[in-house]
Regions:
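Generic secondary-structure boundary/loop-capping signal
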Residues: 81-82, 101-104, 109, 145-146, ...
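Generic alpha-helical secondary-structure signal
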Residues: 66-67, 110, 177
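Radical SAM [4Fe-4S] cluster-binding motif and immediate context
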Residues: 113-216
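General N-terminal targeting signals
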Residues: 17-19, 46-48, 72-73, 110, ...
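Glycine-rich beta-alpha loop elements in corrinoid/cobalamin-binding modules
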Residues: 1-103
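A broadly conserved sequence feature marking short terminus-proximal activation segments
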Residues: 86-129
Length: 216
């Protein structure tokens, strides 16, 4: 699967997807991400499916789970969620079901067990201290809650699911995820990537960190 957050990453994702198909015949190629969510919701030209098999929108957990079920023969195309694909006759099929989501608190923590971060360099793109803060050094990137708790800024597209649908887990779940990630990575610095996480949730997380004596 390829997450395409910006227009500048689209071409490389399509090239890699095309290479993956040639190297691994039968693999399902899936594309999602921020650019897809904002720019590809109204597809009329199916040529992009020369490079990918499926395009998914918004949260990818359930769409990807259904695609795995489809490949294993456990469901049909009609069971797909927030997914677009090209039929054999060249027409495009949409299976949206936009309200189907796995609650954020029920998702498992990310698995870094076989991810060796020593193979990656620390990169500082700009001298701006704000940008350097979250890119210089190795940080555990983590989303504390789904969406934005405020979602009232005039400059923001609050119609997008990853902004407009707020879904926050309990502080206990957040701290347990943090402990799990630290145990796997050995890295104790965290960069929360939320649009705007609930202050009450963050306060609860901080209290638990202090109570449990967790060094982060």
């Amino acid at each position: 699967g390829f997450s395409v957050p910006f227009p500048g990453t689209l071409t490389s994702a399509l090239m890699l997807s095309d290479t993956a198909a040639k190297e691994n015949y039968g693999a399902i190629r899936v594309m999602g991400g921020g650019y897809v969510n904002t720019e590809l919701r109204s597809l009329s030209d199916g040529r992009i499916f020369d490079f990918v098999d499926f395009i998914t929108f918004d949260d990818g957990q359930l769409p990807l789970e259904r695609l795995c079920d489809l490949k294993e023969g456990r469901c049909s195309h009609n069971d797909l969620v927030r997914t677009v694909y090209r039929r054999d006759d060249g027409t495009l099929a949409e299976r949206l079901n936009v309200d189907c989501n796995i609650p954020f608190g029920q998702l498992p923590p990310p698995d870094f067990s076989d991810f060796d971060r020593t193979h990656y360099i620390s990169l500082t793109e700009l001298t701006n201290p704000m940008h350097k803060l979250w890119s210089d050094g190795r940080w555990n990137k983590m989303t504390v809650a789904h969406g934005c708790y405020h979602k009232k800024c005039a400059f923001c597209d609050t119609s997008l699911d990853y902004i407009g649908r707020s879904d926050a887990p309990s502080p206990e779940i957040v701290v347990e995820r943090m402990e799990h990630i630290v145990a796997q990575t050995g890295i104790r610095g965290f960069h929360f990537t939320d649009e705007a996480l609930p202050p009450a949730l963050l306060a609860g997380v901080c209290r638990l960190i202090v109570e449990r004596g967790i060094a982060v």
